[in-house]
Amino acid sequence: MHPILFPPTLDNIRKITASLVAAAKASGHRRALVLSGDREWCLQAAQVSLASTSLEPVLWIAAQAPENAWRMEAAKAHRSLGQEVDAIVFDAYSGFDLDAFGIITGAIRGGGLLLLLTPPLAAWPSFNDPEHARIVTAPYEVTEVTGRFLKRLVRILREAEGVIIIEQGKILPSVPFAAPARAETGGNPPSPGDSACRTEDQGRAVEAIVKVVTGQRRRPVVLTSDRGRGKSAALGIAAARLLQRGLKHIIVTGPRLDAVEPVFRHAQRLLPQATVSRAALHLPEAGMEFAPPDDLIRTSRPADLLLVDEAATIPTPLLERLLQGYSRIAFATTIHGYEGTGRGFALRFHRVLDEKTRGWKGLRLETPIRWRSGDPLEHFVFRALLLDATAAPDSAVASARPETVAVERLDRDALVRDEATLSELFGLLVLAHYQTRPYDLRHLLDGPNLSVYVMRYRGHVVATALLAAEGGFVEETARGIWEGRTRPHGHLLPESLAAHLGLAQAPRLHCARIMRIAVHPAVQGQGLGTHLVDTIIRETGGEGLDYLGSSFGATVELLRFWERLDFLPVRLSVKRGATSGAHSAIVLHPLSSSGQALVKRARERFLVHLPHQLADPLRELEPQLAAWLLRRGDPAGPLPLDSQDWSDVLAFAFGRRVYEVCIGPIWKLTWGALAAPESATLLGEVERNALIVKVLQKRSWQEAAAALELSGRAQVIEVLRRTLRPLVLHFGNEAVRREAERLAGG
């Protein structure tokens, strides 16, 4: 690019902006203008730039904006979902919020402009960004948050096509000549099948959703797209068409109400007679409403059609339960971007669809609606935020095994310069974790408390783990955490151990939390994850840490993985996560004698609380999960039953007395037996589950029968009796066994 040799006067800035917007309108693309300098200069230059155009509306994402301007704080950027604007002014002086930036840039339509206001580019990486407060954790200061991400961003800005940079006091850039503008800035012509649709893609999507209702049951459709392709609009248009045809009740679900509001907005546009509230649309004898995924699973609300928007942000187990509960479903999700990580969704959920449905249809929306294909702003945002980060090709890593890989702790100064490794690493995190978002990229690069481990095979990343340093508080702060007076940001393990298990010493010890761990899908099940954690245990053991830990949505598979590495479960949240639908588990592994004592005490306290929690807040916990949490590694010693207790158990087990008058001793035997490893060979799954749902969780006979897929009380009692008999013979003393044999023969 050849510079124009004149100073950056406001008049010249005005001319450059006008030329840039003309080029944008001619191409149907969006453009970006970076104004870099002192804050007051940036604000003045932005106003002058906009005054040279007819762009309207203009949205300011900034802490301050001109009088009467439409302004929105970055934290509220999600409210722009589904809206279209001609221009956005994004003030990086107010904080470069990556999540907001990813959201808000998608609202600019073709022919529009992004104005990015920044500190002087050379100094921006060392700028005290307000976003640092989100990244920093005690005992670090905000000044210790590095500028690696911003350094990378500046490099990408300078390399990007369609981005013009004007720096205060420096020579102005040239701007490509603008060809005459064309009126059309959209994608393909509207589908002839539906006048409300703006592209052929969208028309096909609407037809596919309608077919879900009019065709055979249990044949869902899955819509995928990049942002700006009209996916949510297709859901809304299809919903309106179906309601017009007489469908009675549609439920819309998604990660949050604001994420699905575009669905309601597009339906309302075609149903002007409808009464609309924020979470519902009502017609005289029909309507559609929003419900969170966990509510749908808990309450089993009936619906003629379930629309699941941003499905990638919902954990696969929840999606599977929705699939089981509703016979007519349309799923939609974003492949790239802040709304979800669609590639991981495809990997996880398509297998479920293959197993659970009679046949499902996948449909990809390719054509942009708000701008033309090949948009340079979209390309820049994808690259800057790594929205298109991709794990290594399957073929390149398929032969990786523990003995052929190398594990290293990365130098993040080198990582930020190594785009290939960064993309493969972040691509793995995207595949493995449904909640990965752009903020995580900045945290990964700049968080002073983080360590990044990678496992390589022939130069490619096959696994990665992120560790966060936690704990190490002085006595006064530790006591404040234990008493609930303070909750330091970013110290999940010590805070939970102190606040939930009452372990006052926990915040004083030093630990590391394995925040994320991901193994390439092509080599999962080969022991690479175990090898990675084993390496981390060895490396961190000599660094003054007392214990390692992790927190995750509890499943039997994950608990089994951590148990193989000698990580013990010490906590299970009493409520399910609103978005995950899972209870959060904490597992710990000691590294020092102090850590050993803490882990032992934490496990003891957990087992003190667990039996009472199973009978109260955890009554609906999956019995398979409860059984795993109860397990002990060592064989059971004598159980706390006296001779009268054994007599009561025998009386029920052999049909001499009813359950209700023997319940105490039965509970004692159940609790002790299920904690013993030998119970796995003594009991089948149905028998074990019967003890958990009825004896430990104290569900009603009807609830227990439903959980066990039995007809009622009599069948549950029969299962309990046959379950207790082998336990009596195994755990009882010689006298108890003789009495059991007598009753069995009598």
UniProtKB/Swiss-Prot annotation:
Compartments reported by the entry: Cytoplasm
Chain's role: Catalyzes the formation of N(4)-acetylcytidine (ac(4)C) at the wobble position of tRNA(Met), by using acetyl-CoA as an acetyl donor and ATP (or GTP).
Gene Ontology MF term list: 18S rRNA cytidine N-acetyltransferase activity; ATP binding; tRNA binding; tRNA N4-acetyltransferase activity
Its EC number(s): 2.3.1.193
HAMAP family per UniProt: tRNA_acetyltr_TmcA
GO cellular component assignments: cytoplasm
A Pfam family reported for this protein in Swiss-Prot or TrEMBL: GNAT_acetyltr_2
Protein name, UniProt field: tRNA(Met) cytidine acetyltransferase TmcA
Main location: cytoplasm
Family: Belongs to the RNA cytidine acetyltransferase family. TmcA subfamily.
SUPFAM superfamilies given in the database record: Acyl-CoA N-acyltransferases (Nat), P-loop containing nucleoside triphosphate hydrolases
Residues making up the signal peptide according to the UniProt record: none
Record PROSITE patterns: GNAT (PS51186)
Reaction(s) the record says it catalyses: cytidine(34) in elongator tRNA(Met) + acetyl-CoA + ATP + H2O = N(4)-acetylcytidine(34) in elongator tRNA(Met) + ADP + phosphate + CoA + H(+)
Region (Disordered): 181-200
Start and end residues of each N-acetyltransferase domain: 405-617
KW Acyltransferase (keyword) present: yes
Coiled coil regions in record: none
Organism of provenance: Nitrosococcus halophilus (strain Nc4)
Record: residues binding acetyl-CoA: 517-519, 524-530, 557, 564
Record: residues binding ATP: 202, 228-237, 370
Highest taxon, organism lineage: Bacteria
This protein's record includes keyword Cytoplasm: yes
